[in-house]
Amino acid sequence: MRYLIKGGIVVDPVADTLTCTDILVEEGMIKEIGQLSDSEAEVIAAEGNYVCPGFMDMHVHLREPGYEYKEDIVSGTRAAAMGGFTSVACMPNTNPVADNAAIISHVLAKARNAAARVFPIGALTKGSLGKELTEMADLKGAGAVALSDDGMPVMNADIMLRVMQYASMLEMTVISHCEDNKLSEGGQMHEGAVSAMLGLKGIPSLAEEIMVARDILLSEYTGCRLHLAHISTEGSVRLVRQAKERGVPVTAEATPHHFTLTEEAVQGYSTNAKVNPPLRRQTDVEAIKEGLRDGTIDVIATDHAPHAYHEKDVEFQYAPNGMIGLETAVGLIFTQLVQPGILTVPQAVAKLTCNPHRVLGLSGGRLLPGTPANITIIDPKLSEVVDPTKLLSKSKNTPFGRWKLTGLPVLTMKDGLLVMRDRQLLE
């Protein structure tokens, strides 16, 4: 199939440019970029819209295998495509844990015809128990693009040291969920005035920051590429900024909920606002925004964490952590970061394209002739009110219901195939 994307504002996140031009797509590849005409191609009118490299969410939980009642590869990638993502990287905290080549191969096989490209992340330790290293070379050989025990932090520094030494030899990125689970044990939300008022045990910022500091030092010692997942505190941003100034090979991500919501969202004991790391203070939100603005934080990722209704419809302390994010992330980025001028369009797009690709050691994230046609088109003027009942994810655990978002994806193309167009998924 031939498509001519006509008159759009093409975003180059590497060159940091916006150019009004056309893109010709043929046989799944970008054939040509320029002022074009092609009588045989189907024209996609893109005037006034941003034509971007296909967005990647490098931190999602697709829940397959083992928890398909929450989400599966089909439903999760459909949600991704609707949200403007052509690629996702899925975390290994499935059942069984993705700690061996067979599970990685299974995920890739199930994702072969999915609505978005799926890049599995393998576990650091067997069962994500933090005791015995996985066969990392086998995981890489099977297709794992990085290593993480996400949600189950490796508490033993000697184990984490050996993890980084082996990962460095394999040229793989270690993704760290930074939490000292002795300091956070029993915690339900951020430790502060709101937790005291609600009578909920708090999780101090220190629980995150002490592990950020440890893992940065281990990365500096081993030379291993370290990526810090969903940092949430002012102190963490400062530690990453200082480490980058020293030349440590560290990158970091932030989620839309951590640059949008504060601990106040938990008022009324809303379980959809219960996440880990928890929603923090306004000063932390501002620090995350500044980290995104100055480049300290490289990536925006959702930590899409679906849970069934019955799991969240319980007393606060019994509810699992997590919220969905694939279908609201882009709107939140444009509404909360681009429109107020915190990020330019190319800067925002970089955190969803070339930067996550670079972190994971993947090619892509830029629109160039001769590369696969993975494309996301954004209408910067289009607004919608979030209706959780209409989201494509199996789970509806979002705190953003009834939020009005402006700047939404109107087309996603995966390897030259239209997956979503005009806010409708194409079957």
Swiss-Prot record:
Q: In terms of domain of life, where is this protein from?
A: Bacteria
> Which InterPro entries does this entry report, sorted A to Z?
Amidohydro-rel, DHOase, DHOase/Allantoinase_Hydrolase, Dihydroorotase_CS, Metal-dep_hydrolase_composite, Metal_Hydrolase
- What does UniProt list as catalytic? D303
The terms under GO molecular function for this entry are:
allantoinase activity; dihydroorotase activity; zinc ion binding
This protein's pathway reads: Pyrimidine metabolism; UMP biosynthesis via de novo pathway; (S)-dihydroorotate from bicarbonate: step 3/3
Q: Which UniProt keywords apply?
A: Hydrolase, Metal-binding, Pyrimidine biosynthesis, Zinc
Indicate whether Ribonucleoprotein appears among the record's keywords: no
Q: Which residues bind substrate?
A: H61, L62, R63, N93, N276, H307
NCBIfam families attached to this UniProt entry: pyrC_multi (TIGR00857)
**Protein family:** Belongs to the metallo-dependent hydrolases superfamily. DHOase family. Class I DHOase subfamily.
Record's function text: Catalyzes the reversible cyclization of carbamoyl aspartate to dihydroorotate.
Name of the protein: Dihydroorotase
User: What taxonomic classification does the UniProt entry list for its organism?
Assistant: Bacteria, Bacillati, Bacillota, Clostridia, Eubacteriales
Supply the gene name. Answer: pyrC
